[in-house]
């Protein structure tokens, strides 16, 4: 609402977190999409030619960038980020970099913020929060880093009406960052082991499924299109046929997501195993009937 007028557009990479689309729709702004390129091993890459073509649209005003990317789990390399940044700067666009998953990366890796490669670009806004890292979404607390002084002042005025910080949320966030380090490292190790468990299960029980272990997030992005080619609504199928609630498909992830499901692996491994076994049984039953 603050950055875009009614005839201007925002750009998303797809698949995309659905609430990026919802935010644009709420503000009455049209959306451009640039599909990520899918590779045979399940990984994704930026289609730089398409991305630049969309940025060059005279109506494009803002890029929603997700780093690390949700739902694919990509941690963009410094080279990728620099190429994206160069395109954004060439067309003088605003960029909102959603980095909420930046703490939830595989052990031994290091997050590269967009701010590192756009060190002096004034139209960068970075969004982070303790809520994913420490499972504190109920705090409704986040860190919004706005470089442009005029925009920051406008945001602060708007914040007086819609975003007053709860003192308890602020205290909880400070405590999490100050004292949660050891817990956070143990969490990352457990998540890494969960991803390895799911990867091995799928390779053994559902070899048609395509999944790679993402560099970041606690979310597995799994291609089940070869397992269930005739099922159009995978979340509905698994809810009703397996008793498993999950997310997937274009309805939530905007586009470029047909045949995919997103699995939350931030839970005890025994629960993950039960869910996977239910999914396997439902898939095998569906395959046998068709």
Language model feature labels by segment:
Residues 117-153, 166, 259:
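Active-site PLP attachment segment
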């Amino acid at each position: 609402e603050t950055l875009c007028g009614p005839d201007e557009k925002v750009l998303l990479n797809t698949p995309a977190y659905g609430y990026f689309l919802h935010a644009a729709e709420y503000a009455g702004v049209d959306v451009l999409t640039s599909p990520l390129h899918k590779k045979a091993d399940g990984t994704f890459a930026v289609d730089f030619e398409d991305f630049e073509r969309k940025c060059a649209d005279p109506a494009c005003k803002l890029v929603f960038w997700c780093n690390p990317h949700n739902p694919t789990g990509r941690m963009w390399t410094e080279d990728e980020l620099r190429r994206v940044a160069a395109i954004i700067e060439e067309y003088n666009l605003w960029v909102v970099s959603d980095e909420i998953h930046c703490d939830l990366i595989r052990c031994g890796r290091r997050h590269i913020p967009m701010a590192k490669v756009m060190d002096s670009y004034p139209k960068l806004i970075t969004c982070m929060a303790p809520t994913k890292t420490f499972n504190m979404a109920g705090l409704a607390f986040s860190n919004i880093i706005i470089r442009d002084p005029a925009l920051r002042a406008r945001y602060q005025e708007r914040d007086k009406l819609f975003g007053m910080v709860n003192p308890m949320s602020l205290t909880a966030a400070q405590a999490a960052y100050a004292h949660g380090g050891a817990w956070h490292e143990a969490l990352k190790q457990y998540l890494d082991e969960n991803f390895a468990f799911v990867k091995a299960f799928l390779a053994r029980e559902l070899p048609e499924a395509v999944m790679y272990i993402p560099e970041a997030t606690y979310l597995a992005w799994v291609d089940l299109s070869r397992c269930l080619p005739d099922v159009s609504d995978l979340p509905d199928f698994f809810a009703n046929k397996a008793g498993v609630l999950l997310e997937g498909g274009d309805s939530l992830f905007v586009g470029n997501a047909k045949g995919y499901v997103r699995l939350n692996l931030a839970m005890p491994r025994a629960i993950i195993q039960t869910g996977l076994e239910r999914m396997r049984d439902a898939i095998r039953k569906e395959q046998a009937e068709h």
